[in-house]
Amino acid sequence: MIQPQTHLNVADNSGARELMCIRIIGASNRRYAHIGDVIVAVIKEAVPNMPLERSEIVRAVIVRTCKELKRDNGMIIRYDDNAAVVIDQEGNPKGTRIFGAIARELRELNFTKIVSLAPEVL
């Protein structure tokens, strides 16, 4: 469950290291975001000499949350960290690599480029 002011790790090589959620895209009064939701975030920490810089506002899709994800078959998935992938306006990732495992639900939400770059899909 990601809400405004939540800090997230970045799971790609776009140049950002840490994001802070400032808005959840989708509804005007939505309180929490889950895996597969798009958020507006500000970069809190960045790698030097990369295209993305600190205090830049970006869009990101959430790929891992500490809060459990229940599936229809009864399986529960929980990750060790909150992580997101920086995307552009079309939903394509800005980085060329994805780090760590991601959930299968992203494929159903048409983030197929992120799923294809991921080393492991749970």
UniProtKB/Swiss-Prot annotation:
<comment type="subunit">
    <text>Part of the 50S ribosomal subunit.</text>
</comment>
<dbReference type="GO" id="GO:0006412">
    <property type="term" value="P:translation"/>
</dbReference>
<keyword id="KW-0694">RNA-binding</keyword>
<dbReference type="InterPro" id="IPR036853">
    <property type="entry name" value="Ribosomal_uL14_sf"/>
</dbReference>
<dbReference type="GO" id="GO:0003735">
    <property type="term" value="F:structural constituent of ribosome"/>
</dbReference>
<keyword id="KW-0934">Plastid</keyword>
<dbReference type="Pfam" id="PF00238">
    <property type="entry name" value="Ribosomal_L14"/>
</dbReference>
<dbReference type="InterPro" id="IPR019972">
    <property type="entry name" value="Ribosomal_uL14_CS"/>
</dbReference>
<comment type="function">
    <text>Binds to 23S rRNA.</text>
</comment>
<dbReference type="InterPro" id="IPR000218">
    <property type="entry name" value="Ribosomal_uL14"/>
</dbReference>
<keyword id="KW-0689">Ribosomal protein</keyword>
<protein>
    <recommendedName>
        <fullName>Large ribosomal subunit protein uL14c</fullName>
    </recommendedName>
</protein>
<dbReference type="GO" id="GO:0022625">
    <property type="term" value="C:cytosolic large ribosomal subunit"/>
</dbReference>
<keyword id="KW-0150">Chloroplast</keyword>
<comment type="similarity">
    <text>Belongs to the universal ribosomal protein uL14 family.</text>
</comment>
<dbReference type="InterPro" id="IPR005745">
    <property type="entry name" value="Ribosomal_uL14_bac-type"/>
</dbReference>
<keyword id="KW-0687">Ribonucleoprotein</keyword>
<dbReference type="GO" id="GO:0009507">
    <property type="term" value="C:chloroplast"/>
</dbReference>
<keyword id="KW-0699">rRNA-binding</keyword>
<dbReference type="GO" id="GO:0070180">
    <property type="term" value="F:large ribosomal subunit rRNA binding"/>
</dbReference>
